[in-house]
Amino acid sequence: MVQWYLEELGVPYEYILLDMKAGEHKQPEYLSINPMAKVPAIVDGDFKLWESGAILVYLANKYEETPISLEEQSEILQWVLFANATLGPGLFLEDKREKETPHLLKPLNEILTNKPFLLGDKLSVADIAVGSYLAYAKILVNFDFKEYPAVADYVMRLSERPAFKETIGNR
């Protein structure tokens, strides 16, 4: 998710893949970046940040998408939080998937019926957050979006982007 957004932004970065099985995320060097021992995390100069949603919003504010109004900022934050707190668990927690998915994807399908991206005609960090979870659902749990054609088209549209192919599509 974060790597995809960095590619979309064209921001130079160093990607470090931790060997989770070997416990690299629990070593003091990484714990100094993220004391929760989770990925992703970034280091930008002396600034360290963890949690994908926080990182996405930080990158948007720093490199591209700082909206003019509080309302626009809040709408972006709404979608990033929805992706991490609601959509992700609804798609990936098996005990919730069957019950939650229709309640999540039906309105999302309606929203995407009339526009190519969540906030209109241009890809935004909101699409990176939501689109990542949708793409991973297709890749990791073989989720079929056939009942949600606008969502299926959205996932296809995102997956055709070069930055997506370079990152999520390459896994």
For each feature predicted by the language model, list its residue ranges:
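GST-like fold's C-terminal all-alpha helical module
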Residues: 71, 79-162, 167
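Short, solvent-exposed turn/loop segments enriched in Gly/Ser/Thr/Pro and often Arg
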Residues: 19, 125, 171
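GST-like domain detector, emphasizing the conserved glutathione-binding G-site
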Residues: 1-103, 109, 114-116
